[in-house]
Amino acid sequence: MDFLLRYATTQTSVGVQTNRIVVNTTRIAHAYGYEPTIMTFQRNMTMTLSPVLGDGRHSYRPLDAHPASGMLQHRHGPLNFFFNAELSRLSWYTYDNHPSLDELEERFQKILNTPPMNRWLVLYLISQANMAFCLLFGGDLVSGLFVFLGTFCGFLLRQELNRRHVYHYLTVVLSAFVASFVVGLGAKFGYEEFPKIALSASVLYLIPGVPFINGMMDILDGYVLNGISRLLTAVMIVVSITVGLSVTLMSLGLSLL
């Protein structure tokens, strides 16, 4: 029970949609002869485990079975597609090989202890990607360079604020403001040929694409409350981005219209 709750809530923290969390967790439970009933919410997860006999579609619950229930709060962490893939792979390994609980825990901890990608490399790649978006949308090279610099400063601030556990939406507001303000300075002093494109591209790295996608997938999979919750979270992030960008526009007397 303890392992399954930690396994499931870890998946939530790294950006896995609800249906995949339920399927992966159920797969592991079946490998050890249990049938889970899982309820997921925005902040916690509840699970009930019932022992079953048999295998596959012919399993049944004994009359003297005593289900056990537990609840655990979701963990908080950044999106991590490596964890997403490895945790899913762990569920298949468990289903096919039936390892001991000690081995399963060891493999789980090995995944969690995987060192993250170098933060400076991530910072450079995201800045480069945002610059590429600016050029792709028709911006000039100078505008792209300002977007690179603005994204670098904004994302660096976001990394530092996240390390200090600053309120999430405030972090987004400040990051959007810093990134757009750096780009706005280039527009204010006439260095950029396409300032509107540059300003629009400067905050693209903050767009919550995964929450939007997961929210829609949850709704389509029937997890309507979870989907709405994720979509509302994504909308709040977009509102925070808008606030940060609006402060820049008002401060520098610029407009996107």
Features from the language model and the residues they span:
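Soluble N-terminal domains of membrane-associated systems
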Residues: 1-99
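Electropositive phosphate-/nucleotide-binding environments in soluble metabolic enzymes
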Residues: 2, 15, 19, 77-84, ...
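Alpha-helical transmembrane segments and their cytosolic membrane-interface
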Residues: 76-143, 233-242, 253
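C-terminal ends of transmembrane helices
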Residues: 107-111, 154-165, 211-226
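Core alpha-helical transmembrane segments of integral membrane proteins
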Residues: 115-189, 193
